[in-house]
Amino acid sequence: MIRRATIVAVGRLRGWAAEGCEDYLRRLRRYFPVEVIEVAEADMNRLGRGEALREEAGRLLRRLPADAHVVALDRKTGRRYGSEELARRRLEPLAVSGRGHVAFVIGGPLGLAPEVLERADERWSFGEITLPHALARVVLLEQLYRAVKILRGERYHW
């Protein structure tokens, strides 16, 4: 299993999304440290789409841990995995390879700039549907928690 996770995301969560993330963070932190770094959303109205995306990219890239294996969440170019495959073929091998620190990068409403995608060691997708960035963060944490349970041979549902 991974030894440490960092989530670097555009935007601050509120309401139900913040509550959902806090629930899964509490569960995950029993197994390994998880840090969440939120960067400010760029003002698209003031900057325009392209410049706003570049500004967010700079903020994200500056906050990515240098020692981490970086996973970008991207609907268009990311690879899709089932829960078992995600646990056994992606997360478990990272720990064995010595790259136990994984940083997940999640864009805001504009997505991720090409330079962020290029920096990533790999890209994941949760499918063809477009998820709001807040929901993508909840889904990521839920899948990480599910992977922990799979790898430890523990029950997920009671």
Swiss-Prot record:
InterPro entries: Alpha/beta_knot_MTases, RlmH-like, tRNA_m1G_MTases_N
Organism: Rubrobacter xylanophilus (strain DSM 9941 / JCM 11954 / NBRC 16129 / PRD-1)
Binding site for S-adenosyl-L-methionine: L73, G107, F126, G127, E128, I129, T130, L131
Phylogenetic placement of the source organism: Bacteria, Bacillati, Actinomycetota, Rubrobacteria, Rubrobacterales
Family: Belongs to the RNA methyltransferase RlmH family.
Gene name in the database record: rlmH
Protein name: Ribosomal RNA large subunit methyltransferase H
EC number: 2.1.1.177
CDD domains: RlmH-like (cd18081)
The protein's assembly and partners: Homodimer.
Keywords: Cytoplasm, Methyltransferase, rRNA processing, S-adenosyl-L-methionine, Transferase
Subcellular location: Cytoplasm
Record SUPFAM superfamilies: alpha/beta knot
Reactions catalysed: pseudouridine(1915) in 23S rRNA + S-adenosyl-L-methionine = N(3)-methylpseudouridine(1915) in 23S rRNA + S-adenosyl-L-homocysteine + H(+)
